[in-house]
Amino acid sequence: MIISASRRTDIPSYYSEWFFNRLKEQYVLVRNPMNMHQIGKIDLSPKVVDGIVFWTKNPVPMLNRLEELEKYNYYFQFTLTAYGPEVETGLPSKNKVIIPSFQRLSKEIGKKKVVWRYDPIFLNEKYTIDYHCRYFAVLASKLAPYTEKCTISFLDYYRNTERNMKPLHIHPLTVEQQKEIIEKFVRIAQRYNLHLDTCAESCDFGKFGVSHACCIDKERFERIGKYKLNVEKDKNQREECGCVASIDIGAYNTCRNGCLYCYANYSGMSVNNNFGKHNLESPLLFGKVNEEDKVKERNVTSLIDRQMTLFE
């Protein structure tokens, strides 16, 4: 089983102590986002957790506790863009905090365990194609020694993102603009020996040498863990998504990064209310189990292929 921690919220930044408590207890409770009264109990013991993918914009709260992950195979999806505080309202200084934390994380765990994400890309009067290219190059120069690749994507429109981003006056991206950005980013990435891929994009950028990313990546885990995994593509993701199956242990409306483009937060009020219900000792990310809730233990097993090959 692979754990996603989490597409729905920034666990390393805001819930790292809770997460380490869950590892000590070796289980976590997760509400079904489609039915909040259904709660899954997930085994977090190393014997069944084959890997953990952390999604974050700021891993600083975890940096002094990485040794507590030594029994697990893991890597980070680390989003670092060129947007300012009017877009990513809750992040600390990128030059003083975020970029140094990226570099430190890579030094401590290795560059193959830190994937840079520059996404989502959108355009307006300030954030033009030239702006993105200029600052993508700046970031690439600082991050290339500390990662193997960069994954990019273009902004997807959801009801809550359209509402939240209205003050930014976004210009819809045309296919030609996407291709222009891809072509220019590829040249920059090549300059710094970075592999470039895209996350769940419907357009084919193969002629630029850019393929679909596998953000929850079977091959990366096999390299890190030196094992073979019998895991299938995640059927719950879009067709263009290359991710393999995983269990997400986060919750929507809990991330305090304040990114206006975020699909996982519906309102700042909901985020604040849910964060106020966070308990470090609770098996749930926020709130508690109520009488009307039904808790069911998920049947999970290790997906590592234990059979010896002919050549082993």
Q: Where are each of the predicted segments found?
A:
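Conserved C-terminal portion of the radical SAM core fold
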Residues: 97-164, 183-200
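A C-terminal junction/extension of Radical SAM enzymes
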Residues: 176-242
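Short catalytic/ligand-binding loop motif for oxyanion handling, primarily in non-cytosolic enzymes
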Residues: 85-86, 122-126, 158-161, 204-208, ...
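Active-site beta-loop-alpha junctions enriched in small/polar residues
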Residues: 8-10, 57, 79-83, 119-121, ...
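Local cysteine-cluster metal-coordination motifs and their immediate loop/turn environment
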Residues: 239, 247-267
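Conserved Radical SAM active-site core
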Residues: 1-88, 95-111, 268-312
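Surface-exposed cleft-lining segments at the edges of enzyme active sites
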Residues: 84-92, 120-130, 165-173
